[in-house]
Amino acid sequence: MSYRHLEQYVHGLPAEGSFSIWAGPVEGPAWVTFRDREPHYAASTMKLALVIAAYRSAEAGTLDLDDTVAVHNCFASAAGGAPFSLDPGEDSDPEPWARQGQRVALRWLAYRSIVRSSNLATNLLLDAVGTSAVMAAVHAVGATDSVVARGIEDAEAREAGLQNLVTARDLALTLRALVTGTAAGRDSCEEIVSVLAAQQINDAIPAGLPPGTRVAHKSGWVEGISHDAAIVFPDDAPPFVVVVCTTSTLDESTGLGLIAAGARAAWSDRPQS
């Protein structure tokens, strides 16, 4: 089968910068890949592995997702230095900030870290789960090139060389494992996919798809970086996975448009029933 639109998309990628794509079915060989094992700073895509780890830990009995923790803004650095705090102005979700001093469920933190990409919810959840459990979840799906070593805005850890890294291939492996029910227990995987489908920040992959298409995805962005990783559920074809990672000097709007174009190409090349 020809994947003409995806191949044209890859050939048209900018010469400067780092661009990666993985597109293909939930099971079986990829349709098209391009630099899919090239590492990128993960940005908020690391929250996908964190949430999977939280559900796996609940299944193992090491935490209860319905347990509550106090909402605060003081975190220990992964580098072992002075505590740090998050900048609320850099967070896309005001809800956890409005609950400072209150207790909230870990399940709610997992939800907010996906649907609004909350940085505060992410670090609170990471405190409960731990980076070792996150890495176990990463390795369980065969994502051998990714690293989650620290929380969000942990500048001291970043300066010490502790980075969160991801590849398009690893994100695709993770999403495929969610659909097949192997990233965690089947019920947990189904719940996580439902949370991903509830994401409210839809300016990358969903923007390249027909309106109303069900998309379960996690995006990530900081200056110079835009990623999105999605399970797409067409009405006329089996679900498929598309991941686009970009590290470049492109402005935010152009970077998002590039990701949307990749999604559009994958949609055009989907094998229809």
Each PLM stretch: what is its role?
Residues 65-82, 129:
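Acidic helix-start/capping segments at beta-turn-to-alpha-helix junctions
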